[in-house]
């Protein structure tokens, strides 16, 4: 089963210092997903970070679906910035120097995240998706309401919102939620 992991285990991943580049990449991608509201790998890899303070994207999974596009808009938290700086390419996208197709890259990332988790003594089965599951779980445990968490991960349900500035209002809630979840990592 793809399990969420504990706050302690997220800290273990964050604080790991692997020598191998592929494991550093695994650590950084996992943490970026956690820091950026459980963003999916495809959306993360397609995003142009050049001169951006916010991350705005339409979930790849929701594009062209009947339910409408799921737009996510979040302020990039400070924790994410050094990781982005480390891997950003001239084009503004993240580049880890691999010439894989996206599918093969995704498989490789999943394998390396599992290897990293094992190496640092995490017993749970950890995959890239675990960052997303854990982000939601930890937020819920901190008392953040589900609607805000669903917005963060791009799963807002009702698309016909009466509130004109829905995204602006939700971004504020999302930013506060992410701050609370990330501050919890500092304890």
Language model: regions and residue ranges:
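Active-site/catalytic core of tyrosine-dependent DNA strand-transfer enzymes
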Residues: 4, 10, 77-123
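Conserved tyrosine-mediated DNA breakage-rejoining catalytic core shared by Y-recombinases
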Residues: 36, 45-83
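Catalytic-site neighborhood detector that most strongly recognizes the C-terminal catalytic loop/helix
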Residues: 59-64, 153-184
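Basic, Lys/Arg- and aromatic-enriched nucleic-acid-binding interface segment
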Residues: 1-41, 45
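Short, basic (Lys/Arg/His-rich) helix/loop patches that form interaction surfaces
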Residues: 15-21, 110-155
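Short, contiguous acidic/charged loop-to-helix segments that flank catalytic cores in large enzymes
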Residues: 18-20, 60-75, 97-105, 122-127, ...
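Short, leucine-enriched amphipathic alpha-helices that occur as contiguous helical runs
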Residues: 10, 23-27, 106, 110, ...
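Short, cationic motifs built from Arg/Lys/His that form the positively charged side of catalytic pockets
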Residues: 39-40, 72, 132
């Amino acid at each position: 089963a793809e399990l969420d992991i504990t706050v302690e285990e997220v800290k273990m991943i964050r604080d790991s210092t692997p020598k191998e580049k592929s494991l550093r990449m695994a650590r950084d991608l996992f943490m970026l997903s956690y820091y950026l509201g459980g963003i999916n790998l495809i959306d993360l890899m397609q995003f142009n970070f050049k001169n951006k303070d916010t991350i705005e994207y339409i979930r790849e999974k929701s594009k062209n679906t009947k339910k409408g596009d799921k737009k996510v808009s979040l302020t990039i938290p400070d924790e994410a910035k050094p990781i982005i700086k480390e891997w950003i390419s001239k084009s503004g996208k993240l580049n880890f120097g691999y010439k894989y197709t996206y599918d093969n890259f995704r498989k490789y990332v999943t394998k390396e995240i599992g290897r990293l988790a094992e190496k640092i003594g995490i017993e749970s089965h950890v995959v890239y998706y675990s960052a997303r599951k854990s982000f939601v779980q930890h937020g819920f445990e901190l008392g953040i309401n589900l609607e805000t968490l669903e917005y963060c991960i791009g799963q807002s349900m009702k698309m016909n919102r009466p509130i004109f500035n829905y995204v602006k209002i939700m971004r504020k809630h999302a930013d506060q939620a992410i701050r609370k979840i990330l501050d919890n990592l500092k304890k």
